[in-house]
């Protein structure tokens, strides 16, 4: 008997009718990710709602919601993060405990080359290679024994001097000065090329499943964005990132309106090029943003994140940092892994100093998530010094945290 595509379709129709996918199954097959949507809310946006208002109930749902948030953050403030380009090659040299990774990336006929020094621990690398910390601009936190450190010259990838830095740097030599990517987005692109190269450089003896990223102040903002956008980062450690980092735009505006001298969106876009020019259109009406930075931080989940803030510096927006990370924490809670998200906020030290009293909190995250040791990482604390401004969670968080199902 002849068998045609038509007869196959006719035979299959009843089966297809019975196997109609559920709403959540359909979303997993097709996830709508616009870069701009209608929105207006003075409260922090609910991370457990899709763009269309339907609920996020499962890990499968979160995969889609994460894609939506990434697209929105790029569309409104970060600019477009390009994918891996067709050309990525590298060379590696090592002498003693000092190595050097040189990466060439771009398109045929238009490539850039940059180098990053790596400091290795003494001794023989463990099975799988050394864990690695990628430090934006240099290390400002203590690193435990047994972890290599790569110093990433992110400012060469995209300058961050002032407004004149727009479109200047190695990234823009590839994608053009008019690329929408902010400097921080360009930094993520460069970091990803480093990881690409390490993945195919066995001589470096780096365990690319155990990579952390860190930075302080402006570089702390960049470290958080790297952890959010680059899923190969195993541990994210922003330090005193302040406005544009682990604080929320809405909460920083509230602090400013309450009389605190903090850096909010209207000022930060005049200082530097950490955000895309499109963000200028929203800084005077933050309520139009369909996200806030609790959701930037939540892009890291389910991977671990611990951030550090300093209440001695009012302009870092201490209430905003605590409130924003309190809101972000609900995503790890929904996943049943709150111990993968930490926050520490104290004072009595200079900006970007790391007091030794904080070492146990930091080393706990290193031990558990990079070194494979047992450690208690249920760490979420503040000294509560918010310059007289009061944090009231119900004023900003109007959602009930779900418990995610698998599907």
Curated annotation (Swiss-Prot):
Its EC number is 3.1.1.117. The active site is at residues 217, 351. It is found in: Secreted. One of its GO terms (molecular function) is carboxylic ester hydrolase activity. Optimum temperature is 45-55 degrees Celsius. It catalyses: a 4-O-methyl-alpha-D-glucuronosyl ester derivative + H2O = 4-O-methyl-alpha-D-glucuronate derivative + an alcohol + H(+). Residues 1-19 form the signal peptide. InterPro entries: AB_hydrolase_fold, GCE-like_dom. GO terms for cellular component: extracellular region. Substrate binds at residues 221, 263, 271, 315. A motif (GXSYXG catalytic site motif) lies at residues 215-220. The keyword Glycosyltransferase does not apply. Belongs to the carbohydrate esterase 15 (CE15) family. Glucuronoyl esterase which may play a significant role in biomass degradation, as it is considered to disconnect hemicellulose from lignin through the hydrolysis of the ester bond between 4-O-methyl-D-glucuronic acid residues of glucuronoxylans and aromatic alcohols of lignin. This is 4-O-methyl-glucuronoyl methylesterase 2. It comes from Phanerochaete chrysosporium (strain RP-78 / ATCC MYA-4764 / FGSC 9002) (White-rot fungus).
């Amino acid at each position: 008997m002849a068998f045609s595509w038509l007869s196959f379709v006719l035979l299959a129709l009843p089966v297809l009718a019975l196997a109609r996918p559920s709403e959540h199954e359909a979303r997993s097959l097709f996830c709508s990710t616009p870069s701009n949507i209608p929105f207006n809310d003075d409260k922090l946006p609910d991370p457990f709602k899709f763009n269309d208002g339907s609920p996020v109930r499962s890990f499968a749902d979160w995969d889609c919601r994460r894609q939506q948030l990434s697209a929105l953050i790029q569309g409104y403030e970060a600019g477009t993060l390009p994918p891996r380009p067709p050309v990525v090659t590298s060379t590696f040299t090592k002498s003693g405990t000092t190595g050097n990774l040189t990466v060439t990336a771009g398109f045929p006929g238009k490539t850039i080359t940059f180098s990053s020094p790596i400091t290795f621990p003494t001794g023989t690398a463990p099975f799988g290679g050394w864990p690695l910390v990628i430090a934006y601009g240099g290390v400002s936190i203590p690193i435990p024994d047994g972890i290599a450190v790569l110093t990433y010259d992110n400012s060469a990838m995209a300058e961050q001097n002032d407004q004149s830095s727009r479109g200047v740097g190695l990234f823009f030599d590839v994608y053009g000065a008019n690329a929408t990517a902010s400097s921080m987005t360009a930094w993520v692109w460069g970091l990803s090329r480093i990881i690409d190269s390490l993945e195919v450089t066995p001589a470096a003896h780096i365990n690319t499943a155990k990579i952390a990223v860190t930075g302080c102040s402006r570089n702390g903002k960049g470290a958080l964005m790297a952890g959010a956008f680059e899923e190969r980062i195993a541990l994210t450690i922003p330090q005193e990132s302040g406005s544009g980092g682990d604080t929320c735009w809405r909460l920083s505006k509230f602090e400013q309106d309450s009389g605190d001298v903090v850096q909010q969106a209207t000022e930060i876009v005049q200082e530097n090029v950490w955000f895309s020019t499109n963000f200028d259109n929203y800084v005077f009406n933050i309520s139009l943003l369909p996200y806030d930075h609790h959701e930037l931080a939540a892009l890291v989940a389910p991977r671990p994140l611990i951030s550090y803030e300093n209440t001695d510096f009012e302009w870092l927006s201490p209430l905003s940092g605590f409130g924003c990370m309190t809101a972000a924490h609900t995503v790890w809670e929904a996943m049943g892994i709150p111990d993968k998200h930490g926050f520490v906020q104290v004072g009595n030290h200079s900006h970007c100093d790391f007091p030794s009293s904080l070492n146990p909190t930091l080393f706990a995250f290193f031990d558990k998530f990079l070194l494979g040791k047992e450690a208690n990482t249920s760490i979420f604390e503040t000294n509560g010094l918010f310059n007289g401004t009061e944090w009231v969670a119900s004023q900003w968080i109007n959602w009930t945290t779900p418990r995610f199902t698998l599907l």
